[in-house]
Regions:
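Basic, alpha-helical interaction scaffolds
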Residues: 1-56, 112, 119-120
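Acidic, serine/threonine/proline-rich low-complexity intrinsically disordered regions
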Residues: 55-63
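Short hydrophobic/aromatic segments of transmembrane alpha-helices and their interfaces
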Residues: 19, 80-81
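Amphipathic alpha-helical interaction surfaces
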Residues: 50, 76-79
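Extended C-terminal regions of large enzymes
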Residues: 41, 52, 65, 69, ...
């Protein structure tokens, strides 16, 4: 929890710089927020979600904090009141919600591990986790895969492509 809050705190100055750039006549002259959103996606999101595929047991509160950070950026960028419905905010920006960004990274990471040789220690840990019915990355990814309509990647990693995961 502290790590996520610290990352958000460190990213705040970048977010403010992006908003200032977007308000500048040369960048925001067309009235579009696309450039600022792309800058946010390129500079802030990678720093914020670095290594998120290993975040086992992330809480709903932490996901909400991350989503609020993104929503706050969008509201400031587009000069929208706090009363603007979140659904409209997400639809108009075209930005992926934090929950699904993290889920995609976890699923892609699990797929990458499962494509490794059977002697790989990480792959063996995932398999042992399933055998022992422990709650770790494999367990979380099984739930995520079911939610987005994919097969369990621990079994179907060879038939599930990166594109399938991204589209889901």
């Amino acid at each position: 929890d502290d790590t996520i809050k610290e990352r958000m705190r460190k990213s705040t100055s970048k977010v403010n710089d992006i908003i200032l750039l977007a308000d500048a006549p040369m960048i925001g002259a067309d009235g579009s927020s696309l450039t600022a959103i792309k800058l946010f996606e390129a500079q802030v999101i990678p720093a914020l979600l670095f290594n998120c595929e290993s975040w086992i047991g992330i809480t709903e509160g932490q996901i909400n904090d991350l989503q609020s950070f993104q929503d706050k950026f969008l509201r400031k960028l587009m000069h929208l009141p706090i009363s603007t419905p979140k659904a409209i905010l997400h639809w108009d920006s075209g930005m992926e919600m934090m929950r699904w960004r993290i889920a995609r990274q976890k699923l892609l990471f699990l797929r990458k591990i499962m494509l490794k040789d059977n002697s790989n220690i990480c792959k063996r840990a995932i398999i042992n986790e399933a055998i022992l019915e422990a709650e770790g990355l494999g367990h979380e990814c099984r739930g995520l895969a079911t939610t987005v309509g994919l097969q369990d990647l621990r079994d179907s990693f060879k038939t599930t492509s990166k594109g399938d995961i991204r589209r889901a």
